[in-house]
Amino acid sequence: MRHYEIIFMIHPDYSEKVSVIIEKYKKIIHHNSGIIHRLEDWGRRQLAYPINKLHKAHYILLNIETFPKTISLLETDFRFNNAVIRNIIISVKKAINEPSPVIKLKEEKKDKK
């Protein structure tokens, strides 16, 4: 099994259904003997540039360990799912469990308040 980092952006019109979409991808990963090492919901964020006339999107980060065939299934689903407007899948050398810089920044802001 290999390690992957996946970030995908969900159309802002589907923000209420984010948990359902996440569960769908978690089922695909677990059904194919995959392990989720990190799952982060970054929330709705401003895009660097408009995509299909959209200025915001809901970001999700996954660090998983799975077989390449599972990645093919995820890529196909991302491609045909209208809720997912962009995605990137990167192969990494080892599992990443610590919080991402985005989450660390959010926690620091909460601590300051």
Curated annotation (Swiss-Prot):
Keywords: Ribonucleoprotein, Ribosomal protein, RNA-binding, rRNA-binding. It comes from Buchnera aphidicola subsp. Schizaphis graminum (strain Sg). Belongs to the bacterial ribosomal protein bS6 family. The gene is rpsF. The keyword RNA-binding applies. GO terms for cellular component: cytosolic small ribosomal subunit. The lineage of its organism: Bacteria, Pseudomonadati, Pseudomonadota, Gammaproteobacteria, Enterobacterales. SUPFAM superfamilies: Ribosomal protein S6. This is Small ribosomal subunit protein bS6. GO terms for molecular function: small ribosomal subunit rRNA binding; structural constituent of ribosome. GO terms for biological process: translation. It holds the Pfam family Ribosomal_S6. InterPro entries: Ribosomal_bS6, Ribosomal_bS6_CS, Ribosomal_bS6_sf, Ribosomal_S6_plastid/chlpt, Transl_elong_EF1B/ribsomal_bS6. It comes from the Bacteria.
